[in-house]
A protein has these predicted regions:
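Extracytoplasmic metal-acquisition and chelation regions
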Residues: 1-215
Length: 215
């Protein structure tokens, strides 16, 4: 892919490359009920594809346990490259691991005590690893890796009906989205729109405020 091509073109032959997808259990990107399909994607053929043609969902960091694994690998790699700084890197990792464990526990307590285990996104959905980690079900306008931004009337109608049928009080959108799909659903259902931050992008204002994965 493009990352491999950039890495191969680097003049730094000592550069270490860490592939996050190779460190954790990964999931294929999926098309759920009501979801707008990828360009050229035929949902009827889903059961016929194999690993060679699968598209992996790359948003592995949305599960805090995966974030711990990835952070540990980064710390280990830095410690090997700069042995004198080993204690510094590993010390920082231990502090960060504690923050991630605390975050994971907060999520588990919140979800264990929630009235519902279902979320609806009027947007793309790059959070499969998150919902798998915490036993949530979801419905969304698009899968996480699509470039599509305009859902069909059928998809919007499905999500509106789902909100009404399941008495969902909140529609989620993701950071830096215009939120138009979620707003349309909310207007038709009397619900409110909230932003779910996927730690994929960050606004200039949030960056300057020091917002992080665990904040």
């Amino acid at each position: 892919d493009w990352v491999d091509r950039i890495a191969a073109s680097s003049s730094n032959k000592d550069m270490k490359i860490i592939k996050m997808l190779d460190l954790v259990d990964k999931y294929e990107e999926e098309i759920t009920e009501g979801m707008e399909h990828h360009e050229g994607h035929n949902h009827d053929e889903d059961h016929d594809h194999d690993e060679d043609t699968s598209e992996w969902d790359e948003h592995v960091w949305t599960d805090p346990e995966n974030a711990m694994i990835i952070s540990k690998k980064i710390a280990d790699t830095l410690a090997l490259a700069d042995y004198q700084g080993k204690d510094y890197y590993m010390g920082n990792y231990k502090k960060y691991e504690k923050e991630l464990k605390d975050l994971d526990e907060e999520f588990r307590i919140l979800i264990d005590n929630a009235k519902r285990k279902e979320v609806i996104f009027g947007d793309r959905f790059p959070l499969r690893y998150f919902v798998e980690a915490y036993g949530l079900t979801y419905y969304a306008a698009f899968p996480g890796c699509t470039s599509e931004s305009e859902p069909s009337a059928k998809t919007v109608a499905f999500l509106i009906d789902k909100v009404k049928t399941d008495n969902i009080p909140v529609i989620f959108t993701i950071e830096l989205s215009n939120g138009n799909i979620a707003k349309t659903i909310a207007k038709s259902t009397g619900t409110k729109v909230l932003t779910f931050y996927t730690c994929h992008n960050i606004s200039k204002d949030d960056f300057e405020k020091g917002e992080t994965y665990v904040s």
